[in-house]
Regions:
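Bacterial lipoprotein signal-peptidase II cleavage site
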Residues: 51-61
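Short, Lys/Arg-enriched N-terminal segments with co-localized hydrophobic residues
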Residues: 13, 19-31
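Intrinsically disordered, low-complexity linker/terminal regions across diverse proteins
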Residues: 78-81, 322-325, 337, 344, ...
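Gram-negative bacterial Sec-dependent N-terminal signal peptides
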Residues: 12, 16, 33-53
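Short, Gly/Pro- and small/polar-rich lid/capping loops
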Residues: 77-92
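Noncatalytic, helix-rich "gating/capping" subdomain that lines the substrate-entry/channel surface
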Residues: 146-446
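Active-site-surrounding "flap" and adjacent substrate/cofactor-binding loops of secreted or lumenal enzymes
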Residues: 80-83, 98-171
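Post-signal peptide N-terminal segment of mature Sec-exported envelope proteins
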Residues: 59-79
Length: 738
């Protein structure tokens, strides 16, 4: 991914790792995932640029994607003007009084930071949020038209009905908590630990993504990720992941300081939610105590981000031996996975610890816990009092956001999560031109060529390892704009008068679609982002990249902008995603996507040493006296930023090698490229959200991502940066991995 989790940092990532953009911001969670929602995620046919008890139904058939209709020829018109400034860069957003060599972020973006107010409904604001606002408006038009079309049929009717049901506030108020009552009654009827285990299995959903989107969070007891097998990427494996917390991370339960106050607010939130739902005799204090016990056995974010530690294959029979406590037969039966022979258990100690708690903690405590999470997850689809209470904690207390998003924005997000590709098909027809795709495809080809040249020039790497690296690069497949085939939603029931039911059925539909992959060959044309999603993705287990249509907008990409700015922004994003195939996680996968060591021991030691130096560099960034960037946590994204920007610079020079260097408004091509990079990472954040991101986001804050330039030799003469300035690094201290 390019983006992060809070609206503070949206990052580029890999392997179903959302690299650029963000997972849902806490206060803007997709109602569809019925909580601070998993990633709010989604470029044309993936073109090669080189050479259990499962539901009876198989994965829904996909429909081949059609290219957007060609635009009609029109009379010649004046060349379009860039959206920003005279050549694609917002020079009014600079602070020219700040020396570039002391604080490049302030130099490039200080004026923007000073004049920009964070919208009241956001925890932070940046380039991703800016583009996402436009994408939301464009999507709203599509949904409004579909909802108003009473003669609509097929997918158009489904998206219109889903959106209309969410927008029907009067209908939702009239029903009260009744749509959720069957689930609450089922929880109340649980009579023993076997029934509890089956009920916990029934809550399992495909709501995490370990490698592509680096989305590890679920409030369900465990998360499930269906993806190619680490050791045999021709087939799928189910990955079981720790979960069970209502707050974002273990530190919120175990640390002191502001976390202690947040725990008090969380307990009060739990009590209010249960009272609103009329759940009798529930005990908020013991729910918090149970979640605290779960947090104590959780693996840390850094441990969870370690692929090699996560590659633990368990046979179904191993669960009872290695993780006693939970009735695993009942759990897997409830999850529809009883016939599955093997699993990959990502955090085995946490899974064992959570399982033991099922046996240890009283049944009534678990029933209270399940009831609370059922209501809290559904709050966006229940009367206003529920949604307001959910936002009061997750939006305001946790992230510092004063105002909830307008209902139409929440409806757009919910609709995208439920029917994202059906909406994306219409979005592409309206908002993604063949000209934009062609120019982006050319940029990709230039970036791949430049990255190959950087591999050839890597003096620290042996010929043997270079050969394998070049093979991996040659096998990289890239999708631009939209998927080559569309998902089939015909089996999903959507009713215009059932907002909560629509969300629950969509979530279950997606879960069943995922577990139906087991035993099937891997579909290497499936997309994990929607075209209207502002992000990008590297999929390490398939050696594949995808770039949705929506990210190809200013300030990342502008067809009317100067090429240097486009390469500094979108070119670096593309380079970032390519580089994820060779970062500290991507480097563990070979050209087929298999977890395999293709390095010589000496080369890998040198690679790790360079990574350690970069982690140490980012450890020095301290946005608060008591909080710093965790360089180990952000290392994969930081490697991709350094390599992506360096590759974008080389690709621009390659594309313009036969053209004279032109100065525009006093800026040289090199200056424009680096300013384009910094502009892409302009950002502001509320303190609570900023602090949360430092704990949980694998992307460094945008302010520090922009300072990646200090590792690029060409930046120094471009801005006359001298020894003694704050961002100056001696040549030997500049990290060059690729």
């Amino acid at each position: 991914l390019v983006g992060g989790k809070t609206g503070v940092t949206f990052a580029l990532c890999s392997a179903a790792r959302l690299c650029l953009g963000s997972g849902p911001r806490l206060e803007e969670a997709h109602p569809m995932h019925l909580r601070h929602a998993a990633l709010v995620l989604a470029i044309s046919t993936a073109a090669a640029l080189s050479a259990c008890d499962r539901p009876a139904s198989q994965p829904a058939a996909s429909v081949p994607a059609e290219a957007p209709a060609p635009q009609k020829e029109e009379a010649a018109v004046p060349a379009p003007k860039p959206a920003l400034g005279s050549f694609g860069f917002d020079a009014t957003g600079m602070n020219r009084d700040a020396p570039a060599g002391d604080d490049f972020f302030e130099y490039a973006n200080g004026g923007w930071v000073k004049r920009t107010e964070i919208p009241a409904d956001k925890s932070g604001y940046n380039s991703f949020a800016q583009i996402n606002e436009q994408s939301q408006k464009d999507t709203r038009e599509i949904l409004d038209e579909a909802a108003a079309d009473m003669a609509a049929s097929g997918e158009r009717k489904k998206i219109g009905d889903f959106y209309a049901a969410f927008m029907d506030e009067a209908g939702i108020e009239a029903k009260g908590v009744a749509p959720l009552q069957p689930e609450l009654d089922a929880i109340a009827a649980i009579g023993d630990k076997a029934a509890l285990s089956r009920a916990l299995g029934g809550t399992l959903r495909a709501d995490v993504d370990l490698l592509n989107a680096t989305n590890y969070y679920t409030d369900r007891l465990f998360g499930l990720w269906l993806s190619p097998d680490l050791h045999d990427p021709a087939g799928y494996a189910p990955y079981l992941v720790q979960g069970g917390l209502g707050m974002p991370d273990r530190d919120f339960y175990l640390e002191g300081g502001r976390m202690a106050e947040l725990r008090k607010q969380y307990q009060a939130h739990v009590a209010k939610v249960l009272a609103l739902a009329g759940v009798a005799d529930a005990d908020a204090a013991r729910i918090l105590a149970l979640e605290t016990a779960i947090a104590r056995v959780h693996a840390s974010q850094v441990e969870t981000n370690d692929v090699e530690k996560g590659a633990n294959e368990w046979a179904q029979a191993d669960f009872a031996k290695k993780a006693p406590g939970l009735d695993w037969n009942a759990f897997l039966d409830g999850a529809g996975l009883k016939a599955q022979a093997k699993f990959i258990v990502w955090q085995p100690k946490a899974v064992a610890g959570i399982s033991a708690l099922v046996a240890k903690q009283p049944l009534d405590t678990w029933k209270d816990y399940l009831a609370f999470h059922a209501v809290d997850r559904a709050s966006s689809y229940l009367p206003k009092a529920f949604a307001d209470e959910h936002f009061a904690f997750y939006g305001t207390a946790l992230s510092g956001t004063p105002q909830q998003q307008d209902r139409w924005k929440r409806a757009v997000d919910a609709s995208n999560q439920a029917l994202g590709e059906a909406i994306g098909k219409l979005y592409v027809e309206r908002h993604f031109s063949p000209q934009t795709k062609a120019r982006a495809d050319t940029m990709v080809q230039n970036l791949i060529a430049a990255f190959g040249a950087r591999i050839d020039a890597a003096e620290w790497m042996s010929p043997q390892t270079k050969q394998r690296a070049k093979a991996k690069l040659a096998g990289l497949r890239v999708g631009m704009g939209y998927p080559p085939k569309w998902r089939d939603y015909s089996a999903l029931e959507v009713r215009r008068d059932d907002a909560l039911g629509n969300a629950q059925r969509a979530e279950l539909f997606e879960y069943r679609r995922n577990i139906a992959k087991l035993g099937q060959p891997v579909d290497r044309e499936e997309w994990f982002l929607y075209p209207q999603t502002v992000n990008a993705l590297n999929i390490p287990l398939e050696n594949r990249l995808i770039f949705p249509a929506a990210i190809l907008q200013p300030p990342f990409f502008d067809g009317a902008a100067d090429d240097a700015v486009n390469y500094g922004a979108m070119g670096a994003v593309i380079g970032h995603e390519i580089s994820h195939s060779f970062d500290n996680s991507g480097a563990l996968f070979d050209e087929s996507g298999r977890l395999a060591n293709w390095w010589t021991p000496e080369d890998f030691k040198r690679f790790e040493a360079a990574g350690a130096a970069l982690a140490a560099q980012f450890d020095t960034y301290k946005p608060f006296p008591d909080a710093a960037v965790n360089g180990k946590l952000t290392l994969g994204e930081d490697i991709a930023d350094v390599a992506g920007l360096a590759t974008a610079y080389d690709a621009y020079r390659l594309a313009h090698k036969d053209r004279p260097a032109e100065t525009l408004d006093g800026f040289t091509p090199d200056q424009r490229l680096f300013l384009g990079w910094a502009q892409a990472w302009r950002s502001k954040a509320r303190e609570q959200a900023f602090r949360n991101a430092l704990l949980t986001d694998v992307h460094a804050p945008g302010r520090y991502r922009s300072e990646t330039v200090r590792n690029i030799d060409a930046w120094y003469p471009a801005f006359d940066v001298k020894e003694g300035q704050q961002r100056y690094l001696a040549p030997a201290g500049r990290v060059k991995i690729w």
